[in-house]
Curated annotation (Swiss-Prot):
Subcellular location: Periplasm; Bacterial flagellum basal body
Example GO biological process: bacterial-type flagellum-dependent cell motility
Gene label: flgI
Full protein name: Flagellar P-ring protein
Taxonomy, superkingdom: Bacteria
GO molecular function: structural molecule activity
UniProt entry keywords in alphabetical sequence: Bacterial flagellum, Periplasm, Signal
Pfam families linked to this entry: FlgI (PF02119)
Stated family: Belongs to the FlgI family.
Role of this protein: Assembles around the rod to form the L-ring and probably protects the motor/basal body from shearing forces during rotation.
Alphabetical list of HAMAP family matching this protein: FlgI
Subunit structure: The basal body constitutes a major portion of the flagellar organelle and consists of four rings (L,P,S, and M) mounted on a central rod.
InterPro entries: Flag_FlgI (IPR001782)
Secretion signal, residue range per the UniProt entry: 1-24
Amino acid sequence: MWPLLLAVALSTLLPLAMPGSAGAVRIKDIATFSGVRDNQLVGYGLVVGLGGTGDKKESVFTVSSMVNMLERMGVAVDPKQLKPKNVASVMVTARMPVSAKPGARLDVTVSSMGDATSLLGGVLLQTPLKGVDGKIYGLAQGSLALGGFSAEGQAARAQKNITTVGLIPGGAIIERGVPFEFNQQDRLTLNLSTADFSTAQQVAERLNAAMGGRYANAVDASTVAMDVPPNYRGNLVPLMASVENIEVAPDAPARVVVDEKTGTVVLGRDVRISRVAVAHGSLQVTVQESQQVSQPAPFSQGQTVVTPQTNVNVREENRRLMMIEGATLQELVDGLNAIGATPRDLISILRAMKAAGALHAELEVI
């Protein structure tokens, strides 16, 4: 009876999980299940085997770490005699999925924290990886893989990409898992990546339609709670696999995002502009500095005088008013392109439109 009920429930969910209208996305692409997330791990370690590109003697924490490591191995050393040029202190980071079990492997990122110039050819020594609770969840060790190189001589240096950050694929072994009673839940929570009341309500309605009952409800703009149907109690994987593939058409407020540092302008799909007349002319000011040298006449006992000379040139384009109106994104783009403005000019135009009340969208500057 149980397999029959499960098959019937899945057959109800599958049609609603098939591709829908244009603009629809899967729930898994805009939301995550509460509790199903990665955990950050971090550790401090030493990378050895560097060809003279490690930390300098001024990195006292590297020297101290080397002394402590050697003493634990039964080797007595004088800190003043250590030269850590082949060793670098590093921070090791990794992301552990909530479902990771002891024995599983994780990729780790190794980043220099001293004044080492390159980690090329280095080997990370055994490094405990701790969670936010201070407990050890894994151990990392292995040879580093870098995406660049660095070579230098006495008068020149060549470098490609960053050489102070490396990766060890599968370099960490999980020693302790995160306790999580996954299948014992009676209620699931979906967290939307972008808060929006319309999207949250739409997700709840799609879930209820898929499960054939009132199981889901929108708690707020970014949270949808769902009771687990009796057919899936103790076996949530089929339910969650079907839920995350249901498609919805996410909604969002109209927004214009501009980045003045790079001159990037991004217009959302629902951005609209009321009828407005725009005239935009660029003002260019050119300042040229030169030195004027005045030489005295021969045998006049005069002195050579150097005086600065400045030439300022101002040019302003004379452009006519143009009418712009955009009921759709394509019309808006065509109207703005007709002005012939550069992306940086467009930022000023959009700001002026917003101040005039013609731009019906949120203007965000990053």
